[in-house]
Amino acid sequence: MANKLTPENIEAAVQHLENIQSGVTPILDGVDRTVVEDAEVVEPLDLGNQVIKKKEKRVFPLIPPSDPRLLMQIAPFMDDTLEQFGFASRKELAEVMYDNMAKYGGLGLSANQVGLPYRMFIMGGHPEIEDGKVRCVFNPFINDISEESVMLKEGCLSFPFLFLGIKRPKWCSVRYTNEKGEEIEETLHGMPARIFQHENEHMNGYVFTDLVSKLKLERAEKAKQKIIKEVQKRQNASRIIT
């Protein structure tokens, strides 16, 4: 069972995402794009007892929200499809997905968000959530959800600087296989439950903007433009100083 989170910790997690996105997402000609060209050596990824030794990062650009690959239901994951994109194993795919999630500053990242047609996502890594526990999730399925719901502000790496209040079940009982092919069943509470539900929607071709009214989305878009202008100011000031 996940550790209980205080409202302060939850807000801190959301602020963490907002802060990191502000630092790594360039604004180009008024259109949000995140393009990464560098590669770097990073620390090993610890997935439970399995330590994956990392070499150079393979970083994929985030595809735009209108890309059909983000809007279609993803077929069940099969191990024999890994070679199509140059992956030797689930563990290697998990490593690359972790690199991308960390690079873009997310709390979760689905494979189709970076153009990979796999029914899998990675989530976790934030020190305030389950002590930074990372889950690599293949073929996710939600068995049950709580009757009680909670409204919280969410972000999505596919929609930089856009934050929406989303009402979700407080907990969810889930099933999936991990990077070792082991079947996992657990009940997630608080932020992990929210992240799992968010990423699972990506598996079925939905994005979080589908869950709110047109009016609510318009208001969030206006707030987003204010954030972008502020980020542009900081980026321009940084270029002048350096």
Predicted regions and their residues:
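Positively charged
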Residues: 2-242
